[in-house]
A protein has these predicted regions:
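Exposed, low-structure sequence patches enriched in small/polar residues
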Residues: 1-333
Length: 333
């Protein structure tokens, strides 16, 4: 609605099934088009853990500079289970057991990307491929009593993302995220460690976890991906001939859930938290797979850490594999 300073407005209404156990920190809480393994044609195990969400929301984003944005979201959500027979989100509050909730939330976010190359006009700006850090801070307040809001809580989240060039060793992509929820809240408001039951790669998710296998109200996650480019592959004749490139990945999650939130849980989800043992996954892979100049694909071989002795499987969840193979594609020319 204004060019300088750049101000944009977004409004959305949606009524759909969503997978809330796939991503944590979002700046604009309007629609998450990647929300859920339901978009995967081929997936591991069954997925009964979808939520039925009716959402009305608005976003106001101030581009104070090209690389510093301040935003405000106002969201009204009616949250219920998509199938009460298989997935309960019941919650005990004020001597009552609730099975669906009206969540009214306000959040403010800051997005700082120093050194990013920004160009173009209109709503969708373009960004250059130069390397730069990204810092995100977000505060969310759940408000009770306004517009029928039933939940009262505060949530703080922060993330840091950057790619480092390590000379001939290649480049290292890093992503750290931390968050804390204050208040007694039901499962959909807690932070489920992001999982991916599909066989395709999805950023910032754990490939060998089922949805809601791990839940926390305080968490720390790290995702690291190192692209060796030609440092390793040039030393292996067959790999060099096929023009493949090698990579290595490591990701971890640590978190805890307060006893008050555990006591209020009436869902059929076990509140496993990676507090006594950090959960991690590691892997190696090949990228630049294709023919000629069309080389969009990569294959990752992934292993996971041992599960905690206290870990309990959720109903209808498949047994976690110790090893998996995932395929990714990144079209670019």
């Amino acid at each position: 609605i204004q060019k300088s300073p750049r101000i944009t407005v977004g409004i959305v209404y949606s009524n759909d099934f969503e997978q809330l156990g796939i991503r944590l920190l979002k700046t604009k809480d309007l629609i998450d088009f990647g929300a859920g393994g339901r978009n995967s044609l081929i997936a591991r195990g069954l997925n009964y853990y979808l939520s039925d969400i009716e959402r009305l929301g608005g976003n106001l984003d101030f581009g104070l500079t090209n690389n510093f944005h301040l935003g405000l979201n106002i969201i009204s959500e009616q949250i219920a289970s998509a199938s009460n027979e298989f997935f309960s989100i019941a919650f005990r509050k004020n001597q009552k057991t609730l099975t669906e909730y009206r969540n009214i939330k306000f959040n403010v976010y800051l997005n700082y990307t120093p050194g990013r190359n920004v160009f173009g006009y209109g709503v969708d700006q373009k960004y250059g491929k130069n390397l730069h850090p990204e810092f995100v801070f977000k505060y969310t307040a759940g408000v009770k009593g306004i517009f029928g809001g039933m939940l009262d809580y505060d949530k703080i989240q922060m993330s840091y993302k950057q790619t480092y060039l390590l000379n001939f060793l290649g480049n290292l992509e890093t992503n750290l995220e931390i968050g804390k929820t204050y208040g007694i809240v039901p499962l959909p408001i807690l932070s489920a460690i992001p999982s991916n039951q599909g066989y395709s790669l999805k950023p910032k998710t754990f490939a060998l976890l089922n949805y809601y296998d791990m839940v926390a109200d305080a968490y720390l996650m790290g995702h690291f991906e190192h692209h060796f480019n030609g440092f390793v592959s040039n030393k292996i004749p067959l790999v060099k001939k096929l023009k493949l490139r090698t990579l290595a990945t490591f990701r971890f999650a640590y978190g805890s859930t307060t006893s008050e939130n555990v006591a209020a849980n009436r869902s059929n989800i076990n509140y496993n938290s990676p507090d006594s043992d950090i959960y991690y996954e590691y892997g190696v892979g090949f990228e630049n797979i294709g023919y000629g100049n069309i080389r969009f694909f990569r294959v990752d071989f992934i292993w996971r850490s041992p599960l905690s002795y206290s870990f309990m499987y959720n109903p209808y969840s498949s047994k976690l594999p110790d090893f998996g193979i995932r395929i990714g594609a990144k079209p670019s020319l």
